[in-house]
Amino acid sequence: LSLDIKKGEIFAVVGGNGTGKSTAMSLIARIRFPYRGKIYLEGKEIGKYSDDDLYHGFLGVMPQNPQSLFVKKTVREDLYEVIDGKRERKSEAYPIEMKKKDAVEGIVSLTRLEGLLDRHPYDLSGGEQQRLALAKVLLLRPKILLMDEPTKGIDNHYKKELGEILRKLSEHGVTILMISHDVEFCAQYADRTGLFFQGNVVTSEESKKFFAGNNFYTTAANRMARNYFPNAVTVEDVVKAINQTEEEAVSC
């Protein structure tokens, strides 16, 4: 498996079930260990990192099931649990030069959890749980964020909110690798998309080009409009192309 992702890039991986996408991500996240070969992060073999070095300030992992990260009775307590409680003291879990309250408030604002802090995590909607799980991961300030099916079980409203959050993270230099069957989400928010097949990424391109030139892995918008607007891969692309065509017709 060979994969090159630029710093601050949102890279999506699509592919059929059973091709090895989630397995590859679990290896990168050190949830599993390879039978053969080695994995290097920033030139260092992944097995030589301590858990603190790997997961605190370097690698963030978002599982398919966000509930697997919830361990407290309120959203607020769950957030502070990540950074070793509310006490302002240095620890391996929180070596950051920022007051914990300020860090939590910043992440709450980014992930739009205001108004949910006193609720039980299991009482939240699917989209709210996804944002809470992301907030817990982001409190550890990862440079690289791994996401497995981030839009699973959430509606279009929360997909848009999640996409906007990922773009903000990308703008701040966080590198994002996500595995997804949601081709519409990938087309809308990923900078590049790669196709995973038989244990490898066999092709990767800028997302709009990837989906516009693909007959199998493409969006519903592209399938319906490709005879008229072959480069349109999202609903927004189609609407923009139609408006442009109408303007050209009027000007003629």
Locate predicted features.
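Helix-to-loop junction immediately C-terminal to a conserved catalytic motif
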Residues: 29
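Conserved ABC ATPase "signature" region
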Residues: 95-116
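Conserved ABC ATPase signature
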Residues: 120-124, 128
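Catalytic Walker B motif of ABC-type/P-loop ATPase nucleotide-binding domains
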Residues: 145-148
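H-loop/switch region of ABC-family ATPase nucleotide-binding domains
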Residues: 180-181
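Conserved beta-strand-loop-alpha-helix hinge in the C-terminal portion
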Residues: 200-224
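ABC ATPase nucleotide-binding domains
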Residues: 217-252
